[in-house]
Amino acid sequence: MTQEYDNKRPVLVLQNEALYPQRRSYTSEDEAWKSFLENPLTAATKAMMSINGDEDSAAALGLLYDYYKVPRERRSSTAKPEVEHPEPDHSKRNSIPIVTEQPLISAGENRVQVLKNVPFNIVLPHGNQLGIDKRGHLTAPDTTVTVSIATMPTHSIKTETQPHGFAVGIPPAVYHPEPTERVVVFDRNLNTDQFSSGAQAPNAQRRTPDSTFSETFKEGVQEVFFPSDLSLRMPGMNSEDYVFDSVSGNNFEYTLEASKSLRQKPGDSTMTYLNKGQFYPITLKEVSSSEGIHHPISKVRSVIMVVFAEDKSREDQLRHWKYWHSRQHTAKQRCIDIADYKESFNTISNIEEIAYNAISFTWDINDEAKVFISVNCLSTDFSSQKGVKGLPLNIQVDTYSYNNRSNKPVHRAYCQIKVFCDKGAERKIRDEERKQSKRKVSDVKVPLLPSHKRMDITVFKPFIDLDTQPVLFIPDVHFANLQRGTHVLPIASEELEGEGSVLKRGPYGTEDDFAVPPSTKLARIEEPKRVLLYVRKESEEVFDALMLKTPSLKGLMEAISDKYDVPHDKIGKIFKKCKKGILVNMDDNIVKHYSNEDTFQLQIEEAGGSYKLTLTEI
């Protein structure tokens, strides 16, 4: 028979994890209760429990004492099923095993369940509950709910409400050494505030009705929790007692030692001023709550790169990098460089110039790592238009774990920079200081940092997006020159597209994964140097441009033959007459290194079926 009633009892069960303080384990219920019987339930203990308004728990505890005084053999042999479930299909549908009631258990007014290692959430019944005939047998529940979780993620205790009752069960007649799950009985209401750590009354004390609560806690122990004791045990567990599995990637910090702008707008990233080509230190460290603890696997790999601050498509970014690269004096000019300082190389290893705008290295998170980085591009170097506002740049740091073979970094942070040339960073700071001193306090709309409080250390701002892959600029003809030392980052040929590549491979399990077999290394490809000469005949006023296909004497002869219709096989000698009047024989060395974009007057003389050519320098 079911009926509604107001007395309900919530039950809280903490999962038994090895992270919590250890207690002695018992191999069976009888061993656990054997220690209980060594400290019998005295009248004083019952009185204390009654004073605190928990007569039900006192009665249930006495019932369990009586139950476990009977030897197991007698309990197993005399146990008889006495409960019939009127809705077996419903119980089967909810995956709750049908259990039989023992005479000793059914005689009590309250039932308490011995719980094994199954982790439970906190369950708070609410709404209509099934009535329990305390003088008769238990009836099958109308609704059965089983709640379990894997971990207890936070210190604060959170309650859950369900619209229906929960399974009411009793221990099975036959003892099972490893039960898969147990069902909790509750039939009295308890204030949910008792489950919060700050709800304990000042005079409340933790009561230990038996010796089990004072012993060490160990995985596998069987414990009985009474609702009155739960509220007493929970406040005694501080937040420090909970050991969290910290998420990788939230415990790194990078700092840049450089001048910061005095005009920082609220909500904007800190602007740092750098000089082009000047090296600045970047410090990398792990910020862990457990300082002094050395990690067994402590190697990580970080990639420092210069990227565009604004959201641009991959094609736009590669176009900007290509334009910048085409305007450099040498094709080997990189966007970012790392200094060979001893202070830096004592803390990092396996340095790789994986791209023209990125450098990677390995470091130990047990120690701080310091690298010295220079940026070789201005914000205005990516456009041919004069006077336009430059593109904002970021220094971005991606850190990969050797434990994770994914191409996704465990941490990403960035710092917004503005690069000046010829000590422009210092001039910019002095200009801001002058403007700050002239401006009155009443006119200040943007908060200014006083010069005496200005810090020269910028902390990188964490980046939430870890899925977007950065664009790395790798010219095809110079990919073989990107390595430093004996290691190069293995990038599949299909990952190289056009003028650049997206970083598609993260750090790997061991350092050997970074090595490339000799057979797969790309051969060094040197771009041939081109030579351009401006030549005119003595009778002409306009010069002709001679572009040599190869910077050699043979290339010069082919260019003259094509331009002036001189048979190539009949050209005998070619001379160069310098401005000082010196006449020298032209050779490959002079053509390649000393003739590019020079102006000459060409004189062609025919003698004996061959031609003599003289290039007089103008």
UniProtKB/Swiss-Prot annotation:
Effect recorded for residue 427 to A: Loss of activity as transcriptional activator. Strongly decreases affinity for target DNA
InterPro entries, per database record: CP2, TF_CP2-like
Effect of substituting residue 430 to A: Decreases affinity for target DNA
Transmembrane segments: none
Effect caused by changing residue 378 to A: Decreases affinity for target DNA
Segments for region (Transcription activation): 1-91
Superkingdom as given in the UniProt entry: Eukaryota
Tissue: Isoform 1 is highly expressed in brain, pancreas, tonsil, placenta and kidney. Isoform 2 is highly expressed in brain and liver. Expressed at very low levels in non-steroidogenic cells.
Listed Basic and acidic residues bias regions: 74-92
Residues covered by region (Interaction with DNA): 380-389, 427-430
Location in or out of the cell: Nucleus
Post-translational modification, as annotated: Methylation at Arg-9 and Lys-116 may be involved in regulating transcriptional activation.
Domain Grh/CP2 DB: from-to ranges: 248-474
Molecular function GO terms recorded: chromatin DNA binding; DNA binding; DNA-binding transcription activator activity, RNA polymerase II-specific; DNA-binding transcription factor activity; DNA-binding transcription factor activity, RNA polymerase II-specific; DNA-binding transcription factor binding; identical protein binding; protein homodimerization activity
Effect on the protein upon substituting residue 385 to A: Decreases affinity for target DNA
UniProt function note: Transcription factor involved in epithelial development. Binds directly to the consensus DNA sequence 5'-AACCGGTT-3'. Important regulator of DSG1 in the context of hair anchorage and epidermal differentiation, participates in the maintenance of the skin barrier. There is no genetic interaction with GRHL3, nor functional cooperativity due to diverse target gene selectivity during epithelia development. May play a role in regulating glucose homeostasis and insulin signaling.
Quaternary assembly: Binds DNA as homodimer. Homodimer, also forms heterodimers with GRHL2 or GRHL3.
Misc. remarks from the entry: GRHL genes (GRHL1, GRHL2 and GRHL3) show a paradoxical lack of redundancy despite their extensive sequence identity in the DNA-binding and protein dimerization domains and the fact that the core consensus DNA binding sites are identical. They have related but remarkably different functions during embryogenesis because of their differential spatiotemporal expression patterns during development.
Family matches, as PANTHER family: GRAINYHEAD-LIKE PROTEIN 1 HOMOLOG, TRANSCRIPTION FACTOR CP2
Protein family membership: Belongs to the grh/CP2 family. Grainyhead subfamily.
Protein name: Grainyhead-like protein 1 homolog
Organism the protein comes from: Homo sapiens (Human)
